[in-house]
Amino acid sequence: MQTPEIKEGTEQYLWRRKTMNPGDKGVKRKGSDRQREKMSVIVMAGTEDARRIISRLSGMPWVEVTATATTEHGSDLAEKSGASRTVTGALDSDGLRELMADLDACILIDATHPFAAQATENALRACRETGTIYVRFERPEVIPDGVIRVGSFREAGEVASSLIGDGEVVMHLAGVSTLGDVLRSLEPERVAVRVLPSTSSIEKCLQLGVPPSHIIAMQGRFSAEMNLALLREYRAGAVITKESGETGGLPEKVEAASELGIPVILVERPEVNLEGEAVFGNINDLMDHVLKILRDMGQPGD
């Protein structure tokens, strides 16, 4: 397991089991002689949805929010949204379980991306093993008409390779982490990819052989007009994207491609068994549920 980095305000340090100051930020260890000054909630972040949830929770003075994210960029955004503590780095179920114990967490809110199936499975396992309450925010599915639905990015690359003509490229709008599978069936110079403007994302594209002129480093959600301009500029003959919902800008991508008559290859979400779990597609409903749980537990000092 990669050791995550924890950041509290301006102080940064590496997390090790039992090295976190138990009195820091109002966190107390479990025990009959100790009482939490604040109720600890973990939010698995890295999405716009998570940032909205963090912002809502951070406005409650009796709740302390710890956000986890796989990248420094994700942690920075979570901190700006109001998280009092951020944990940067991938956490497996053991890492999450130890973090829950160190924070004496009441609830874990999983607001990770719909395609972060492994993260969700890790969270479910850790919560079941510790008895921590698990709550999932799941973006409502959006499947536009006319798209080509596939089950994997490798399959998406295979389909795209059969659709583009001479001088055309595949516009990859599904992030750098999925690019390697797509390139199994396509030469790197036949792909243009839009990625976050981070050094790691750009370096990965270059390592995979994508020409620098085909790397579009931008952060958004983008309008249909912006997508349309990019598709025209790069002479896209097909688009690869994933079912990331409205928050992920899927409708705008499909609208732009449809205007140009370009086929859209849509990779469907991986399935995770959430039967019996509290799953919400609306943040207001999720917050109502979480607040009821916290009030039933009793605010600190009750």
From Swiss-Prot:
The protein's annotated pathway: Cofactor biosynthesis; adenosylcobalamin biosynthesis; cob(II)yrinate a,c-diamide from sirohydrochlorin (anaerobic route): step 7/10
EC number: 1.3.1.106
Recorded GO MF terms: precorrin-6A reductase activity
Keyword annotations from UniProtKB, A to Z: Cobalamin biosynthesis, NAD, Oxidoreductase
PROSITE patterns documented for this protein: COBK_CBIJ
Gene Ontology annotations of biological process type: cobalamin biosynthetic process
Key word NAD present: yes
Reactions the enzyme catalyzes: Co-precorrin-6B + NAD(+) = Co-precorrin-6A + NADH + H(+)
KW Transferase (keyword) present: no
Region: Disordered, residue numbers: 1-37
Compositional bias ranges of the Basic and acidic residues kind: 1-10
Domain of life: Archaea
Signal peptide coordinates: none
Family membership: Belongs to the precorrin-6x reductase family.
Function noted in UniProt: Catalyzes the reduction of the macrocycle of cobalt-precorrin-6A to cobalt-precorrin-6B.
UniProt protein name: Cobalt-precorrin-6A reductase
Taxon lineage: Archaea, Methanobacteriati, Methanobacteriota, Methanomada group, Methanobacteria
Gene designation: cbiJ
